[in-house]
């Protein structure tokens, strides 16, 4: 029951943020799916469908914004080229801060040492 509430919360958050950022970027998208992915925070299909990991609702809002912008940027560039990151940076100039947070959290969660910075969790 709790997981279902998390997924509903995630659907609401990602639906609102995708609509907002899609207008800023000047792109459209298909459907939004909320998933429990083990290795991804989000993805964008070649048809423009967006998938987001519901666990992101526990991340700082800036990180959620980054994932949404990252996936929507794929509607302009279906790769991780310089042009892709230029799209991301045009909306979120400090996106590298959010990328680092995500990388650090993943290392923390899956590390054998379990040495995590208190600011991450």
Range-by-range predicted roles:
Residues 71:
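Walker B catalytic acidic pair
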Residues 1-66, 75-121:
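Active-site-proximal or metal-binding-adjacent scaffold patches in catalytic folds
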């Amino acid at each position: 029951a709790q997981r279902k509430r998390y997924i509903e919360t995630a659907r609401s958050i990602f639906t609102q943020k995708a609509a907002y950022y899609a207008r800023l970027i000047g792109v459209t998208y298909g459907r939004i799916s909320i998933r429990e992915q083990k290795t991804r925070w989000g993805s964008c299909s070649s048809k423009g469908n967006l998938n987001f990991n519901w666990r992101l609702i526990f991340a700082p809002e800036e990180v959620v914004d980054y994932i949404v912008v990252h996936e929507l940027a794929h509607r302009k560039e279906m790769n991780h080229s310089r042009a892709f990151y230029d799209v991301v940076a045009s909306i979120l100039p400090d996106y590298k801060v959010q990328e680092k947070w995500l990388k650090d959290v993943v290392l923390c969660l899956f590390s054998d040492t379990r040495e995590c910075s208190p600011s991450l969790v």
